[in-house]
Amino acid sequence: MPIIRGTPMPTQQENRSNKPVRMVAVDMDGTFLNDDKTFDVERFERILTRLSRHGIYFVVASGNTYTKLRQYMHGFEHRDIIYIAENGAYVADDSGELAVHHFAAEDLPRVYEILNGMPQLGIVVCTAESSFILENREKTVMNIIRDYFEVQGKPLPQNIDPFAFASMFYPGTERISSYEQVRGVPIKFSLQVTHRDIP
């Protein structure tokens, strides 16, 4: 249960006065974060302190993983921030996991079948435990990396490891040889293509 200044967020049943729960929710990429993936820490410290003083929740909402969001908010641990990660599939706060919305197990074989038929896609399988990339997608991932640096106008680093690169965006990414090795039930399939593949 999210906590602000020692007071649990009331459930709808507990909130008999119908007093609205106040919160500020922000997206990260292109909104809260600058182009270099940073933010004004001192200014945010002042804002967060003021929000907390008035009983207003600060919510980070993003398609990023929970681990990545915690990296962005390093230094603000135990400040009662609520995280809505993986496009809403994973919700947590400083006390831990609050809600997880995963794919139905009976749907996964068909999802895997469809993805196996699309070799041009870079695929990251995200669960509440970790993120996973298939080893047989290494060539595809490398093409996407080259495209990324080309679009950014940056030189491609020498001896780049596709899995190390993926870990920049999906911390703790693990190599797997088949979908059967995914730990946990998927909550998101992140699909990547090169800009040339976008019609």
Task: Label every PLM stretch briefly.
Residues 1-8:
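Short, Lys/Arg-enriched N-terminal segments with co-localized hydrophobic residues
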Residues 33-35, 98-99, 188:
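Short, contiguous strand/loop micro-motifs
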